[in-house]
């Protein structure tokens, strides 16, 4: 960071008291850390000093602004924004000695707002910083920062700001990398404004300023070449686009960019402001802990503030250590992905219900629960810390169970760690004499049925898991017993083992303890209907469906997920240019499965690299066939089904 710090030699009004001298010394020490860019030390020192000052005075304002700047550098934008907002509100505007604090504070606030997906607030902060800039380079920084955010919220406004920045830079900047960054921002503004030919020209200039299409690739080269590839793709020049992607090293990983543990797109609808036809390219980086360090939009088919919802979704993704290890450091630092919002309805699963019941039982036992942030890697790190602390404090086995449960069910944890945690939490829980449903959940975990990736589609229930049906405590509880029966039947149905699934389903239907309209009985009847249909017995399928009492819409949410009967992918689906340039990748889709096993409404929601494998994947799943389900009017057999397809050059 360029030093533009003006020392404030006396934080407080002159005083003879020893306390005042102590505060001044503390301020000087914090300032030394701040000036030396030791951000953690500076943030801690200013935080301690803030508590000793009057809340709304000049001194407190200076401390809060500088603490906020330090926090922003530490990647703690929420805390930074809070401190900066308070500090800037009380910072005297007419005090010339604080001019740099005003500028630096506004710039830091803009970056914090940008990082927390508040684009309009970020733009406002950058625009307020621009007239406060102490020199031409600082003004250039403010203009280009505002333009960078405006590229995806208001491309026309971004062009005005970046053109002013380029005019200011003309003849004054010899740094080609900085000049390339300015042309990249201008290119993105044109790209988001659908001026693809002009965008290509601008982005091509940025690439040339960085040395052209060489085999040397750094983060800056990666961004510029990727932008150029996107512009070429949107302009319809696929051959050139694939070449640029190859030089950006996008898709050159053997198996494509390793997918995260929970790569969910944002929902479409009023809550996000996103429409099904919206598409965005999001740039993000992954930290050493497997969490997303930053995420920001690069391109939006419909520019506006709502596009940050794509970036917000990406910020919640996580990578398990074994997956993260497959991603080279360059791509962990920065990669791009194509995204669309999800129209899939929330489909309840038995495992989600079991997990919720286990957590509720822990809470009812007055046990401290593991933190739930929604980010798998963050929750995993917190559970590990809490578990270590409680082991050191000789906590009881059951007190450790909630944290072990979090690790066992966290997709960012390595398989071996999940297995060990599952065995430990289940044993502790079983020893606490839990109610039948919790006993079943613990038994499943102990059997290895859900603790690791070994419980996968098509594997069927393990022998140990099936023995839970004979546990007297479970057998005596109607709901727990029949929940397990349907769960195990579904695992058989996934591999079309109808003969193994049918006895379990018939047992649910025959259980006289269930009411005729009970959801478990209805779910079993729907599954029997599908098995009868697969066996060619249409009258039996119709009768079972009618006995379920469910509508077609209810059925689509409660039925077992259909299994693939014919996967239609082949070499003909691999884009020719991608083969020529050895580009690998993948795409994730969602669609409905009709009662006859065909698909409809196939959409690519996430794809890597952008605009390469999304449409080929859509075509594959448009041809793929699934098991048939009985629906009287031929409606949807399964709504919001999700599937992915990988592409690999051998």
Regions found by a protein language model. Name each.
Residues 10:
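…; additionally, a secondary subgroup of soluble metalloenzymes is captured
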């Amino acid at each position: 960071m360029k030093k533009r710090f003006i020392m404030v030699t006396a934080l407080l009004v002159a005083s003879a008291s020893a306390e005042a001298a102590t505060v001044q010394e503390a301020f000087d020490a914090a300032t030394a850390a701040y000036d030396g860019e030791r951000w953690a030390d500076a943030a801690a020192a200013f935080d301690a000093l803030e508590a000793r000052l009057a809340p709304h005075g000049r001194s407190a304002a200076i401390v809060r602004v500088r603490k906020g700047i330090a926090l922003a550098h530490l990647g703690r934008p929420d805390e930074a924004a809070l401190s900066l907002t308070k500090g800037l509100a009380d910072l005297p505007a007419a005090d010339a000695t604080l001019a740099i604090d005003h500028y630096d504070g506004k710039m830091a606030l803009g970056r914090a707002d940008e990082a927390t997906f508040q684009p309009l607030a970020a733009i406002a902060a950058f625009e307020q910083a621009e007239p406060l800039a102490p020199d031409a380079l600082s003004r250039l920084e403010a203009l280009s920062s505002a333009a960078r955010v405006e590229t995806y919220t208001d491309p026309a406004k971004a062009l005005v700001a970046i053109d002013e920045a380029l005019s200011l830079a003309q003849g004054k900047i010899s740094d080609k990398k900085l000049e390339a960054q300015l042309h990249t921002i201008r290119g993105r503004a044109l790209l988001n404004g659908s001026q693809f030919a002009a965008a290509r020209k601008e982005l091509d200039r940025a690439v040339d300023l960085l040395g052209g299409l060489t085999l040397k690739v750094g983060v800056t080269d990666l961004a510029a070449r990727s932008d150029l590839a996107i512009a070429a793709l949107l302009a319809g020049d696929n051959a050139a686009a694939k070449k640029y992607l190859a030089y950006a090293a996008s898709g050159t990983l053997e198996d494509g960019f390793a997918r995260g543990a929970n790569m969910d797109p944002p929902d479409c609808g009023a809550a996000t402001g996103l429409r099904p036809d919206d598409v965005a390219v999001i740039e993000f980086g992954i930290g050493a802990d497997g969490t997303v360090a930053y995420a920001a939009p690069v391109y939006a088919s419909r520019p506006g503030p709502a596009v940050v919802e794509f970036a917000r979704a990406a910020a919640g993704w996580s990578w398990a250590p074994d997956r993260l290890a497959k991603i080279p450091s360059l791509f962990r630092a920065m990669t791009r992905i194509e995204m669309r919002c999800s129209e899939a309805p929330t489909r309840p699963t038995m495992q989600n219900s079991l997990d919720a019941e286990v957590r509720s039982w822990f809470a009812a036992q007055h046990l401290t629960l593991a933190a739930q942030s929604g980010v798998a890697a963050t929750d995993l790190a917190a559970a590990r810390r809490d578990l270590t602390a409680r082991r050191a404090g000789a906590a009881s086995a059951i007190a450790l169970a909630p944290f072990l449960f979090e690790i066992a069910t966290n997709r960012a944890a390595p398989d071996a760690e999940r297995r060990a945690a599952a065995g430990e939490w289940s044993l502790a829980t079983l020893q606490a004499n839990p109610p039948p449903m919790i006993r079943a959940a613990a038994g499943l975990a102990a059997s290895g049925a859900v603790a690791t990736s070994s419980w996968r589609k098509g594997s069927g229930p393990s022998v140990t898991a099936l023995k839970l049906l004979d546990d007297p405590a479970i057998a005596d509880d109607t709901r727990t017993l029949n929940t397990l029966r349907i769960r195990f039947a579904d695992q058989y149905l996934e591999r079309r083992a109808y003969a193994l699934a049918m006895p379990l389903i018939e047992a649910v239907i025959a259980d006289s303890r269930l009411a005729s309209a009970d959801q478990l009985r209805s779910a079993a009847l729907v599954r029997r209907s599908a098995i009868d249909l697969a066996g060619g017995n249409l009258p039996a399928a119709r009768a079972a469906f009618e006995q379920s009492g469910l509508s077609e819409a209810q059925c689509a949410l409660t039925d077992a997920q259909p299994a693939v009967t014919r996967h239609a992918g082949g070499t003909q689906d691999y884009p020719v240019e991608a083969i020529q340039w050895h580009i690998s990748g993948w795409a994730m889709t969602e669609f409905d499965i009709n009662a006859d096993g065909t698909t409809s409404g196939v959409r690519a929601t996430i794809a890597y690299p952008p605009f390469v494998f999304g449409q080929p994947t859509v075509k594959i799943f448009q041809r793929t066939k699934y098991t048939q389900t009985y629906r009287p009017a031929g409606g949807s057999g399964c709504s919001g089904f999700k599937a992915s397809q990988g592409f690999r050059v051998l």
